[in-house]
């Protein structure tokens, strides 16, 4: 049987091929983060959790259709526990609901989880409007689809097999539907378990840095489209409905949403190429402070939603019981919480089961007291539990990009030189970004580029610290404050943060991307630590664009997504600056023309001191390795 990762990879590759042949809000980061020198917040430890199954079998009922307010019908598959001969139990049960765009009739990522069902849960998968075998037009988390979420919740809570307590579960697409549902606090919605969820659809992935993601977005649109054209077995009993849905989904893809949205982004459409209401309404961080439903967030250090996962927790924690678990995962790995159990953390299914057992079944199992924050720490190569995110003892330190290629906490001298970078549109392909921003798919192919950034660094300028004399702990967002100019009319700027081992291997920890003309920042929505801006909030609107003149020197603030790492004693910290992160970032056509054939200069003198602001935690705040690990 194919595992979840295999199902996702196969689906993406098949649908990408089909696509290529067939198709010719405000964030919670707007605040000042202050340091807490006491570090008094309690840090809890993980406890094991297992519960024996209650039922030996399960059964999936015949497909049902849920009629929406406008007559559109959504396809639903319901799986219930069963007795030894396959009869569904008659006792009403708590329900685990998943609303998906990946066709609930295909199995794989949309198959019921026996672990939950056999422990006394009904599990329901619903194809959102215009996807799978549901009728209607898909609009990817738009207002109409969001209204459907609540109607589905109403329907599920009232069914005879439901006891009215509903939890939501699932990765990626199936995680964003949870967060968008939870902002309405439906009375039946008692808990959610959001695995690798998007938070800000524009800034996270689709247009990070003002450039469209060419590694993931086209393949993802193709995946949803391709899976929407696969009929459920039951559909052959109603050929008229089958053909109607097939025609509707095809027209939707070509003329109404998928193709038009992608083309609009590439051509610079005001609605999709900029951070408009189109994106804000689809981004859970816009209204994350409204959520009162207990929420468990799972993220990945190399996930495509790396930026927003800790920010979602941050926006939730003051209004509900929220937990955060971040692993060393790309999107595919994080979708299945790969590698657990480890370091005292239970298996992913056991964590979710404990969460639902407490909030849906009322079991006094201590789930509410799980560790608030659990993070994997690069360099330590282990998970640790921490009191909060951002860490209560967070400080900021500024390191300067020196003219001699060094990285130092000492400011630049007046006569220090500058460095140049050729603006090549395909630079970055030999870096870990290619694996990360393809959701981990391209990372399955063997390449030396993913574990060592030195090949890619030949196309960038690098600034490297002296070997660390003591372990150096960073945890949080990073900001690069650069002074640049270009001989072209615009520039793409990528900044990478790497750990350089004594043998010279350069391991990329995280990165950030920005189109220079999109450099306008709203200081009121940006994050500050100890007086330093550490996470800029770029406006990304058409009106806020700041065109460059040839050879004009400008200051830009590049947002580098959060990471957690210890640069070990004897290792060095490296910042590299380049002009492209292909295929993660592809500028809209007109921006690309403005950037071609340019030479970008990075300045390092006292009047134009390029630097990075790092999120530093005292190494003493890092929990020690537990005995026996």
Q: Could you say what each language-model-derived stretch is?
A:
Residues 19-22:
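C-terminal motif of bacterial Sec signal peptides marking the signal peptidase cleavage site
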Residues 48-91, 464, 468-470:
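N-terminal cap/lid segment of alpha/beta-hydrolase-fold proteins
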Residues 85-158, 206-208, 336-340, 501-502, ...:
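Cap/lid segment of the alpha/beta-hydrolase catalytic domain
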Residues 118, 182-290:
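Accessory cap/linker subdomain of secreted extracellular hydrolases
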Residues 160-173:
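Alpha/beta-hydrolase fold nucleophile elbow
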Residues 291, 297-299:
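Short beta-strand/loop motif that positions the catalytic acidic residue
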Residues 307-322:
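Active-site-adjacent alpha-helix of alpha/beta-hydrolase-fold enzymes
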Residues 341-629:
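C-terminal, loop-rich substrate-recognition/catalytic regions characterized by aromatic stacking residues
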């Amino acid at each position: 049987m194919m595992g979840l990762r295999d199902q996702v990879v196969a689906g993406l590759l098949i649908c990408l091929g089909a696509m290529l042949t067939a198709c010719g809000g405000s964030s919670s980061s707007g605040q000042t983060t202050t340091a807490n020198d006491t570090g008094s917040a309690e840090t809890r430890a993980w406890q094991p959790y297992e519960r024996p199954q209650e039922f030996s079998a399960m059964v999936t009922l015949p497909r049902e259709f849920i009629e929406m307010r406008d007559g559109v019908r959504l396809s639903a598959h319901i799986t219930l526990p069963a007795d030894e001969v396959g009869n569904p139990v008659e006792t009403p049960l708590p329900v685990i609901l998943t609303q998906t765009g990946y066709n609930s009739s295909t199995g794989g990522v949309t198959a019921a989880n026996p672990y939950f069902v056999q422990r006394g849960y009904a599990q329901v998968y619903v194809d959102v409007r215009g996807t799978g075998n549901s009728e209607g037009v898909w609009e990817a988390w738009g207002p109409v689809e969001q209204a459907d979420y609540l109607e589905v919740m109403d329907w599920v809570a009232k069914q005879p097999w439901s006891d009215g307590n509903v939890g939501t579960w699932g990765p990626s697409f199936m995680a964003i539907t949870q967060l968008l549902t939870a902002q309405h606090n439906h009375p039946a919605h008692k808990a959610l378990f959001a695995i690798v969820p998007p938070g800000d659809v524009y800034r996270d992935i689709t247009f990070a840095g003002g450039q469209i993601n060419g590694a993931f977005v086209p393949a993802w649109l193709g995946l949803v489209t391709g899976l929407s054209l696969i009929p459920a077995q039951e559909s052959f009993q109603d050929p008229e409905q089958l053909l109607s849905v097939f025609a509707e989904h095809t027209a939707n893809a070509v003329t109404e949403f998928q193709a038009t949205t992608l083309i609009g982004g590439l051509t610079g459409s005001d609605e999709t190429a900029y951070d408009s209401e189109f994106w804000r309404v689809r981004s859970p961080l816009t209204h994350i402070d409204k959520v009162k439903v207990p929420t468990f967030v799972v993220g990945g250090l190399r996930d495509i939603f790396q930026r927003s996962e800790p920010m979602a927790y941050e926006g939730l924690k003051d209004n509900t019981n929220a937990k955060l678990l971040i692993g060393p995962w790309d999107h595919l790995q994080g979708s299945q919480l790969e590698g657990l159990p480890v370091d005292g953390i239970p298996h992913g299914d056991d964590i979710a089961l404990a969460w639902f057992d407490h909030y849906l079944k009322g079991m006094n199992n201590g789930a509410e007291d799980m560790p608030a924050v659990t993070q994997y720490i690069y360099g330590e190569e282990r998970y640790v539990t921490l009191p909060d995110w951002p860490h209560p003892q967070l400080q900021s330190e500024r390191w300067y990009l020196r003219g001699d290629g060094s990285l130092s906490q000492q400011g630049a001298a007046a006569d220090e030189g500058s460095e140049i970078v050729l603006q090549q549109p395909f630079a970055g392909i030999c870096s870990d970004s290619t694996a990360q921003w393809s959701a981990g798919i391209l990372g399955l192919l063997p390449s030396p580029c993913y574990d060592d950034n030195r090949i890619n660094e030949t196309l960038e300028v690098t600034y490297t610290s002296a070997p660390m004399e003591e372990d150096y702990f960073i945890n949080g967002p990073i900001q690069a404050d650069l002074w640049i100019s270009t001989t072209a009319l615009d520039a793409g700027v990528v900044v990478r943060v790497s750990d350089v081992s004594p043998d010279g291997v350069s391991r990329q920890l995280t990165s950030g991307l920005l189109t220079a003309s999109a450099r306008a920042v709203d200081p009121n929505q940006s994050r500050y630590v100890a007086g330093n801006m550490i996470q800029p909030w770029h406006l990304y609107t058409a009106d806020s664009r700041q065109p460059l003149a040839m050879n004009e020197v400008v200051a830009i603030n590049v947002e580098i997504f959060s990471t957690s790492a210890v640069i070990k004693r004897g290792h060095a910290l490296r910042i590299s600056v380049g002009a492209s992160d292909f295929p993660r970032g592809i500028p809209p056509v007109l921006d690309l023309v403005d950037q071609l054939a340019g030479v970008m200069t990075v300045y390092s003198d006292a009047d134009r001191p390029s630097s990075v602001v790092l999120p530093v935690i005292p190494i003493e705040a890092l929990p020690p390795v537990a005995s026996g690990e």
